[in-house]
Regions:
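Sec-dependent bacterial lipoprotein signal peptides
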Residues: 1-18
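Helix-termini ("caps") and immediately adjacent flexible loops/tails
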Residues: 25-29
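Central antiparallel beta-sheet cores of small beta-barrel/beta-sandwich binding domains
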Residues: 33-185
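Bacterial signal peptide processing site
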Residues: 20-23
Length: 185
């Protein structure tokens, strides 16, 4: 009888301990996601970075590079994602598409927005990769000039170059892409 009680107590203790163990996620899953998306900024670099001169990739023209605010980066890096908006995005216009009237004036009627599959953003660099059905793999690597950006922000945007980089879409690469800053509407 005592043996049955001891065996029952041992089984009960084993089940109690087993229920306390936490389920583990596959090794590397969260680290892999967070490693693909990284921002380490100490200043507000948010805004629209627009080409100083036209940048063409086939029929597509770069409209802007967008950098969000710190909270938008944190939301994305925390796993909350949108299919239409990211903290770093590139937008292209189909230069062959008809022009239409918008609240900001005339714009091409067909655009392609490229959301990130990877980014690394600091106070002085922007490294971005994404994909779009229209352009395929898109990459941008740029150097940000903090002093020029500070001047542009004080002046609420101007024509001065604040970032210079290399843009690749599909199999075409454009070097020395020069961007100015605009805070947006």
């Amino acid at each position: 009888m005592h043996t049955r009680i001891l065996i029952g107590a041992a089984l009960l203790a084993t089940f109690a301990l087993a229920s306390c163990e936490r389920a583990t996620e596959p090794a590397g899953a969260p680290a892999a996601i967070s490693a693909a998306f990284n921002h380490t900024t100490t200043a507000d670099i948010s805004g629209y970075y627009m080409p100083v001169e036209p940048v063409r990739i086939g029929q597509w023209s770069l409209d802007h590079l967008f950098l969000g605010q710190a909270s938008e980066f944190e939301t994305w890096e925390g796993g909350s994602r949108s299919e239409t908006f990211g903290p770093v995005m590139l937008q292209f216009d189909d230069a062959a598409s008809p022009m239409v009237a918008t609240e900001l004036g005339q714009a091409h009627s067909v655009t392609a927005r490229v959301l990130p599959t990877r980014y690394d953003v600091t106070d002085t660099t922007v490294s971005f990769e994404g994909r779009s059905p229209e352009l395929g793999r898109v990459a941008f690597d740029g150097r940000l000039d903090p002093d020029a950006l500070a001047t542009a922000r004080r002046n609420l945007g101007d024509d001065g170059v604040v970032m210079t980089g290399t843009l690749t879409a599909g199999r075409q690469t454009v070097r020395d892409v020069r961007l100015r800053w605009w805070m947006g509407d």
